Amino acid sequence: MTPLMNTTNDLTSENKSTQKSRRIGNVVINIGLFIAGLCVSFGIAEIFFATWESYLLKTMGVFVPVDPKYDGAAWEVDPMQAGRFVWQADGNSIVHIRSKNKKLMYELRPNAEISEIIKINSGGFRDREYPKEKPSNVFRIAVVGDSVTFGWRQRLEDTYPKKLEALLQNHNTPNTQFEVLNFGIGGYNAEQEAELLRVKVLDYHPDLILIGFCPNDGQIGFDGGLWWHFFHGPSRTVSFIRLMSIYQEYKADSLFLLRRAYRDILNISQETNIPVHICIFPMIQGDELYVTPGFIQLLEQLNLPYFSLVPLFAENDYKQLMLDTVHFTVAGHEFTAQNIYEYLVRNKIVPLSTSEIANN
């Protein structure tokens, strides 16, 4: 082979190598441009969906705080004037744990304690320790609800469930014991309350279940956006897709969450033969007390017994009974307990003698 031919072959090989390198380079550039395009598109989508997400949340009445990680430093100074908890990145707080139950989303942390004011028992609810097995001479009432029932900014003994327990104990003979267990959890809505009823409350074998209903229990977001903290994903796009599925139901029926939850509660009552009574609490809106439109009609359709405290609050100086738009002062808790007590006795919902308890 002549030197000229060798040179030609070398040039051909170099050209092929150069062309191959160019092709690889072009592929890399195209992939890079494609990825960059995806990033830009995703960024635009995030901005777009964030805008529409805000619109949907506003339409659905969801309250979203600017920063869901509340400043809980005040708890260390004055727990009675605080009431907010620092949420960690893993979805926990000093008194909350992220629940394995997707319907509950979060629960109270067993044995959590804050400055002698907030104590969570080993069962994961704010009350004294109670055995799951109920003694034979005890009539046990389970109270389920949100932060109003929990006792926002109040001591346990000042909450309406414990005041109701004291009233019932004073009414009967020494041999008769009443237990009123407080299963309230701040931020829970009606569906979470129904799920809590099924997976935890029934384990304590209650004879009667009371559900404290607040008008915001039917909203998608409630009590300072706790729901939002657990529902919101790292991506606005993913969050928007989730939110749209809920919005479609909300748009079709503004009571869809309450309707679904209270049907479940009714089923639980029928399955277990445990009576359930709904206590309807007020919410201040402007200068008036707000009542969820259609809720009482829903309860009547389901044949669920209820007792509304709204007119009773309206007849009194309700601003002295309310700590804010939904939560009660100590006087408000006492007023609520007294009226629930009278409702239970007047309608003979609770036994009034030892013999009646024995036969229950």
Task: Identify the residue ranges that each predicted region occupies.
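N-terminal Lys/Arg-rich, disordered targeting/topogenic segments
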Residues: 1-26
